[in-house]
Amino acid sequence: MSAAKNININLKIWRQKNAKSKGSMESYKLDNVSTASSFLEMLDQLNEQLVNERKEPIAFDHDCREGICGMCSLYINGRAHGPDTGITTCQLHMRMFNDGDTIYIEPWRSAAFPVIKDLVVDRSSFDRIQQAGGFVSVNTSGRTMDANAIPIPKHDADRAFEAAACIGCGACVATCKNGSAMLFVGA
């Protein structure tokens, strides 16, 4: 891993006063961002700059900052959680960006996640998913083996567990092109 350096970035961030107001992208310039800092630390740095300029800081969700809770979910440059794969927004580091880059930051774009303010969305849709069981059940009329009776090799089970470890970030719902499908429990 290379040594941390400072970069200057341009930010285009979704701003929206409340759920009823119309939002828009606003531009910001942020200098001396350490490539060792996390994406959320960069947003903290921007908010500190805005407060010092007597401007309204950007509202964004976060909690654990360890990739456990899913609260930090954002679209970054049009991708859920940004340019890296297999991570949440809080696990994204600024070393993924270059000096002079323009970074677009938006809240989840889904009817299931209405914007409350800026980058903060209403996540109550996950309560409905959990109440619905979070899966689609199929009536097999007793003609198939019970899934619990089918042995699965440990290697396959370990790989499946990694893919199934949901932290409730909502990326699956926010990015699903089939979000209005009748069987889609997240819609």
Put a short name on every predicted segment.
Residues M1-A187:
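Signature of N-terminal electron-transfer/Fe-S-associated modules in redox systems
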